[in-house]
Amino acid sequence: MLLLLPEITLTLIALLGQCFALMIPNKNRIIYNIVILLCIISIFLTFKYSSYEGIWHSFATERNIGISKSIILLFTIVSLIIYRDYSILVGETLKFEFITLMLLSIVGIFVAISSRNFLLLFCGMELTALTSYALAGFKLNDIKSSEGALKYFILGSLVSCLSLFGISFIYGFGGSIQFDDILHQLNNDSEIKPGLIIGIVLFLSSIFFKLASSPLHFWIPDVYEGSPISSVTYFTAASKIGMVIVLLNISKLIIGNYYPINYNLIKIIAILSMLFGAFGAIRQTSLKRLMAYSTILNIGYVLIGVLLHNQEGYKAALLYILIYAVVSIGFFTCLIMLFGKDVDNASFKTIEGIAETHKTIAALISIVMFSMIGIPPLTGFFGKYYLFYQAINKKEFTLAYCGIFTSVVAAFYYLKVVKAMYFSKKIAIIKLPMQYGLLLINYLVLGFLLFGSFIILF
């Protein structure tokens, strides 16, 4: 029972909180803050009970999994705080359905991370997917939000069918859906079973779709553009971290006796993601769409770490996705503090000259952009350096050179943001009331970007 405590706790918090919010509608803000406090307590419970060994063959808990869940929950809490402060800033009523959907989505991610069985992993991913579709379309009267959510749902449903079809192949040719059983077969069978490999590839399509890696990335620009900013922070941070951990959990199945087949497939996906992400962003004017392409690019970098297939590569991948999640949250909170209700229309045009009127926010956005480029001594530099160093050390020169090349290309549009703020004509922006939750998040991000490198080094 203690092993399932994080999942049970979050489910109860979500459902009971929703019930109280419906019964006492005029106290939504108080209930919302209580739920955030309970989620913070859940972080410590998740970490505390993560040392117990798994009670089921299909469900694993260990210290590393507990740490992963705690980090994901922390990023989720940040997204919830952003939603609360954004609602206060623009004068909207807090909708408790948002926190319910997000917490249930996290339960799905937790199940997926602990899964050691393809069917259980599929169920966890689908719970996350279904709630994510609703979060993407949470702006009910917005055409772009509805369009993005519908596209996300249709493509996601198609990929889910492929994933389930893949599980049937795995069971049919492997005789089991347990990770350990399939791994034992792959390591001991003298002949490779093509049907088993096809099944694994079909199942992987679902993970790559949720990661928004190319060529399964076409949904993400429209979804980011139409979704509420709070949902976008969740998709960029907690959701992506969870899917990267899931991918690392099944990495032994991806790269085994059939190494050349799946290795080359994932290598192509990584290179395409880096190229599409880098060049696709150049023509963008919307800052939310720009970050969508930036996500595609950075997922390509993460896949480099997965392809290295060693502990150092996995550490580099996890470190990089964590740094990118923090940087993205910093960028989105700055946009909220600048534009408030008009944040969805934020573009290069709307940030022109803001350095004259919003010096602190412009400086923070600049630091975020420099970290994304990988300029030392910011934390983003050490994330990229560690990743590319491990790739070169493993003699993966193609991946390393492609990563360095696309980093140079991406520097063009990251610096374009800085140029618009400091070297363009001023456009008047109304100063909005200060929201201390957003301000605290921004200062924490700033501290991480400036001093996080010392943690990495020492």
UniProtKB/Swiss-Prot annotation:
Protein localization: Cell inner membrane
GO biological process: ATP synthesis coupled electron transport
Keyword vocabulary terms for this entry: Cell inner membrane, Cell membrane, Membrane, NAD, Quinone, Translocase, Transmembrane, Transmembrane helix, Transport, Ubiquinone
Entry's EC annotation: 7.1.1.-
Catalyses which reaction(s): a quinone + NADH + 5 H(+)(in) = a quinol + NAD(+) + 4 H(+)(out)
Domain of life of the native organism: Bacteria
GO terms, molecular function: NADH dehydrogenase (ubiquinone) activity; NADH:ubiquinone reductase (non-electrogenic) activity; quinone binding
Recorded GO CC terms: plasma membrane
Transmembrane segments: 2-22, 30-50, 71-91, 93-113, 118-138, 153-173, 196-216, 235-255, 261-281, 290-310, 319-339, 361-381, 397-417, 438-458
Enzyme class, UniProt record, top EC level: translocase
Pfam family, one: Proton_antipo_M
Bilayer topology: Multi-pass membrane protein
Main subcellular localisation: membrane
Quaternary structure annotation from Swiss-Prot or TrEMBL: NDH-1 is composed of 14 different subunits. Subunits NuoA, H, J, K, L, M, N constitute the membrane sector of the complex.
NCBIfam families the UniProt entry points to: NDH_I_N, PRK05777.2-5
Matches recorded under PANTHER family: NADH DEHYDROGENASE (PTHR22773)
Role summary: NDH-1 shuttles electrons from NADH, via FMN and iron-sulfur (Fe-S) centers, to quinones in the respiratory chain. The immediate electron acceptor for the enzyme in this species is believed to be ubiquinone. Couples the redox reaction to proton translocation (for every two electrons transferred, four hydrogen ions are translocated across the cytoplasmic membrane), and thus conserves the redox energy in a proton gradient.
Protein family membership: Belongs to the complex I subunit 2 family.
UniProt name for this protein: NADH-quinone oxidoreductase subunit N
Species for this entry: Rickettsia prowazekii (strain Madrid E)
